[in-house]
């Protein structure tokens, strides 16, 4: 009778320790720290952020107008409106 009780007690103790260790290791993996020395400035990540916002949208609008040889006339990020001028670039 003593052997099953000791075995179950030991099993509960081991299972609680392993769950604690697993939770501790997964918390370490989820921790993110930003330090300029360990992760230097990346201009490509900044470029991705700008493409999402207003500056990026109007920049793409201006590039599209320049490819057509026109000036940018209107850029509205809220309405997603990009208009080029009628006259060509001289």
Curated annotation (Swiss-Prot):
Residues 1-19 form the signal peptide. Changing residue 79 to A: Reduced interaction with PRK6. Normal pollen tube attraction. Expressed in the pistil. Detected exclusively in the synergid cells. GO terms for cellular component: extracellular region. Changing residue 68 to A: Reduced interaction with PRK6. Normal pollen tube attraction. GO terms for biological process: pollen tube guidance. Changing residue 68 to G: Compromised interaction with PRK6. It comes from the Eukaryota. InterPro entries: DEFL_AtLURE1-like. Changing residue 83 to A: Compromised interaction with PRK6. Reduced pollen tube attraction. Glycans are attached at residue 23. Residues 67-87 are annotated as: PRK6 binding. Changing residue 70 to G: Compromised interaction with PRK6. Belongs to the DEFL family. This is Protein LURE 1.2. It comes from Arabidopsis thaliana (Mouse-ear cress).
């Amino acid at each position: 009778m003593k052997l099953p009780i000791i075995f179950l007690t030991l099993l509960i103790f081991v299972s609680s320790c392993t769950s604690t260790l697993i939770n501790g290791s997964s918390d370490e993996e989820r921790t993110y720290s930003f330090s300029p020395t360990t992760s230097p400035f990346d201009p490509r990540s900044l470029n991705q952020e700008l493409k999402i916002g207003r500056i990026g949208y109007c920049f793409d609008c201006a590039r599209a107008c320049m490819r057509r040889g026109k000036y940018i006339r209107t850029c509205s990020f809220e309405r997603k409106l990009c208009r080029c001028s009628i006259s060509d670039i001289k």
